[in-house]
């Protein structure tokens, strides 16, 4: 993802359209925030399990990618939970059962499929509803999550294609929006403009 002149938003970017055959059940913005938290919670658990499996199968770099992405999902959960807590004090985050993990290549495809769904279906639908309700905070949070998820999908597909040809590159996680950069050739987050020296390396 290239750094733009301004932070990308639904107003200045053209990749916020929603798929025609949407599988997302859209409710109120509060309900959508809760649904997003549930989805991100499941993703965090899944990627944590996938990281463990990748390491056991000898894919150290891919294990670090799964760990970075699991941490990114925690960032999204925190942002979404903060909004829910404002709207519904006392709300408790959901829990999920420990997921299964499979061969590393299949885990990467599973991860990519989930990230593509969130990028092309779930978050665009939630952004649209938040706009209708005039909830600018939710639009902001959903937008940053959507943009980060598209990069997560890209990272998973690249790792899948190069599974037998790993390199030594580290993954760098933005602490604000969950963007993940591979390698050292960047100065700031292209989504929220956070400087490189605040990122966490995996």
From Swiss-Prot:
Lineage: superkingdom: Bacteria
Annotated binding of Fe cation 1, by residue: 40, 73, 118, 149
GO molecular function: iron ion binding; oxidoreductase activity
All copies of domain Ferritin-like diiron, residue ranges: 23-168
Residues noted as binding Fe cation 3 in the record, renumbered to the chain: 174, 177, 189, 192
Residues that, per the record, bind Fe cation 2: 73, 115, 149, 152
Claim: Manganese is one of the keywords in the record: no
SUPFAM superfamilies, per database record: Ferritin-like (SSF47240), Rubredoxin-like (SSF57802)
Disulfide bonds: none
Keyword Thylakoid on entry: no
Protein keywords: Cytoplasm, Electron transport, Iron, Metal-binding, Transport
Compartments it resides in: Cytoplasm
Domain Rubredoxin-like: 169-202
One GO cellular component, as annotated: cytoplasm
Function: Exhibits NADH peroxidase activity (in vitro).
NCBIfam families: Nigrythrn
Subunit annotation: Homodimer. May possess two rubredoxin-like centers and two hemerythrin-like binuclear-iron centers per dimer.
This protein's name: Nigerythrin
Species this chain originates from: Nitratidesulfovibrio vulgaris (strain ATCC 29579 / DSM 644 / CCUG 34227 / NCIMB 8303 / VKM B-1760 / Hildenborough)
